[in-house]
Amino acid sequence: MLTRKQHELLLFIHERLKETGIPPSFDEMKEALDLASKSGIHRLITALEERGFIRRLPNRARALEVLRLPDSIAPGLSPQKKFAPSVIEGSLGKVASVQPVRPAPAPQNSEAPATVSVPVMGRIAAGVPISAIQNQTHMLSLPPEMIGAGEHYALEVKGDSMIDAGIFDGDTVIIKRGDTANPGEIVVALVDEEEATLKRFRREGASIALEAANPAYETRIFGPDRVHVQGKLVGLIRRY
């Protein structure tokens, strides 16, 4: 399975070769994927080459050849720059961006309260970080008082690293989208632009700590440029 960034880079190279016959430069790839440095592009290209999706042609500058595409990629699909909610399951086809949620109008002549439709974006790791793949699976109707104002999405939890915070494998967490968090808040964090996880946010000096709520898991420390908050926990749904 390719990570989201690997998919994006493969598609970007493929589309550029189709359009111009010339592979993109490292600067163009870095800009297209919104990465901070070329080293991230080098890692992605190496991973794609090891998996048999591309090859580098010897003795030629900027020489890349796409050998194959994942079966699930729709024809003509183009990569998107920005990250939406981090998920792992569902189709690896067209990337779906989260749209702001709005209350659904109640039927006329009905006393039923309005609900808010929240996109369920697949599953998020509450354990070892897993590949971040974006795909909306379905919509979830919630009472508006459960989430309040703002843009929200839902994720199904996979893993047991947050059990001491009352978050269990199979639960559905409601996330308010945002890129900041206060120490102690539970967040969806994107690590190295590729992996997503649900953890408690802490600061360790200039570094960021992603803290599990299970003693079986170690707290992981990252430089501030390696972690990007994608939203924070505001609700939880459990089915029995």
UniProtKB/Swiss-Prot annotation:
Residues 26-46 bind DNA. Its EC number is 3.4.21.88. The keyword Repressor applies. The active site is at residues 161, 199. Represses a number of genes involved in the response to DNA damage (SOS response), including recA and lexA. In the presence of single-stranded DNA, RecA interacts with LexA causing an autocatalytic cleavage which disrupts the DNA-binding part of LexA, leading to derepression of the SOS regulon and eventually DNA repair. Homodimer. Belongs to the peptidase S24 family. One of its GO terms (biological process) is SOS response. HAMAP family: LexA. GO terms for molecular function: DNA binding; serine-type endopeptidase activity. The keyword Ribosomal protein does not apply. CDD domains: S24_LexA-like. The record marks 126-127 as: Cleavage. It catalyses: Hydrolysis of Ala-|-Gly bond in repressor LexA. Keywords: Autocatalytic cleavage, DNA damage, DNA repair, DNA replication, DNA-binding, Hydrolase, Repressor, SOS response, Transcription, Transcription regulation. It comes from Brucella abortus (strain 2308). May be constitutively autocleaved; RecA is constitutively activated in this strain, leading to continuous transcription of recA. This is LexA repressor.
